[in-house]
From Swiss-Prot:
Organismal lineage: Eukaryota, Metazoa, Chordata, Craniata, Vertebrata
Natural source organism: Mus musculus
Extent of the transit peptide: 1-45
GO-annotated biological processes: mitochondrial electron transport, NADH to ubiquinone; ubiquinone biosynthetic process
Segments of this protein annotated with the region Disordered: 44-93
UniProt function note: Membrane-associated protein that warps the membrane surface to access and bind aromatic isoprenes with high specificity, including ubiquinone (CoQ) isoprene intermediates and presents them directly to COQ7, therefore facilitating the COQ7-mediated hydroxylase step. Participates in the biosynthesis of coenzyme Q, also named ubiquinone, an essential lipid-soluble electron transporter for aerobic cellular respiration.
The entry's keywords: Acetylation, Lipid-binding, Mitochondrion, Phosphoprotein, Transit peptide, Ubiquinone biosynthesis, Ubl conjugation
This protein's name: Ubiquinone biosynthesis protein COQ9, mitochondrial
InterPro entries cross-referenced by the UniProt entry: COQ9_C, COQ9_HTH, Ubiq_biosynth_COQ9
Length: 313
């Protein structure tokens, strides 16, 4: 009963998110990484420098209290070599750089604080910068998913431009969607050993809203570039079905030991064909719900079995 209630809650959130997407204007927004209440980044890089600075003069202290019109120049940061930098203008920019650098160390350390610390050190920062983030790896995983979605969007946008210029042939919808899902899933391959753990973290209650936002935005992008112009109930069902296909194929991929994940792509092609052959009837709505429940329940069971394993079957 608890699992059913959890799935119902997730489905409710997915439905609400699809409704929000449907009401967006044509200019589509991109989900941003949810900000956290970070400790100031200046403390990691300039604490020693501040200790050595002389006290401000009274004129300086007066100017600092005059409001935004008397803004101070941006702080200068000192890396471990003692050289000054002005690269990091805000904590969000520093966060983005650290998480991007940390992805290189995920294959060795997983979605952990150790990977983030290594990423910080690769930028010349103290490993203590990892304390800016939570200990469960959520920010790193969500950052990775956001980056992958942005890369996919760029690929689809470039292809659309080539088609519009007559330099590429427009593909059929089923082929386009299959290739789009495969392109997105292939981005997981360098991290496939640790991806079951990532999915289990994304299923934690506090991570479900941002992860669903990323999923629904991704499938909306796929349908948008596929040329979907539906304005009726099919708008919702198509995106819900594609979300279910993506999730179930992702689970198959984590257990696939065939060369180059051939079994996964065969499974994906069959699911896309099934979806495209659906009739626009009540049976389609029922199949949509079944696909989503199958994907979410399968995720819960599979992740329970896979979490902590370091080798693919």
């Amino acid at each position: 009963m608890a699992a059913t209630a959890a799935v119902s809650g997730v489905l409710g959130r997915l439905g609400w998110r699809l409704l929000q997407l449907r009401c967006l204007p044509v200019a589509r927004c991109r989900p941003a990484l949810v900000p956290r209440a970070f400790h100031t980044a200046v403390g990691f890089r300039s604490s020693e420098e501040q200790k050595q600075q002389p006290p401000h003069s009274s004129s300086q202290q007066h100017s600092e209290t005059q409001g935004p019109e008397f803004s101070r120049p941006p702080p200068r940061y000192t890396d471990q070599s003692g050289e000054e930098e002005e690269d990091y203008e805000s904590e969000e920019q520093l966060q983005h750089r650290i998480l991007t650098a940390a992805l290189e160390f995920v294959p060795a350390h997983g979605w952990t604080a150790e990977a983030i610390a290594e990423g910080a050190q690769s930028l010349g920062l103290s490993s203590a910068a990892a304390s800016m983030f939570g200990s469960d790896g959520s920010e790193l995983i969500l950052h990775f998913v956001t980056q992958c979605n942005a890369r996919l969007n760029q690929v689809l946008e470039e292809e659309q431009k080539l088609v519009q210029l007559g330099q590429a042939e427009k593909r059929k919808t089923d082929q386009f969607l299959r290739d789009a899902v495969e392109t997105r899933l292939r981005m997981l391959i360098p991290y496939i050993e640790h991806w079951p753990r990532a999915l289990s973290i994304l299923l934690l209650p506090h991570n479900i809203p941002p992860s669903l936002n990323l999923l629904t935005s991704m499938v909306d992008d796929m349908w948008h570039y596929a040329g979907d112009q539906s304005t009726d109930f099919n708008w919702y069902t198509r995106r819900a079905v594609l979300a279910g296909i993506y999730n179930t194929t992702e689970l198959v991929m984590m257990q696939d030991s065939s060369p180059d994940f051939e079994d996964t792509w065969r499974f994906l092609e069959n699911r896309i064909n099934d979806a495209m052959n659906m009739g626009h009837t009540a049976k389609q709505v029922k199949s949509t719900g079944e696909a989503l429940v199958q994907g979410l329940m399968g995720a819960a069971v599979t992740l329970k079995n896979l979490t902590g394993l370091n080798q693919r079957r």
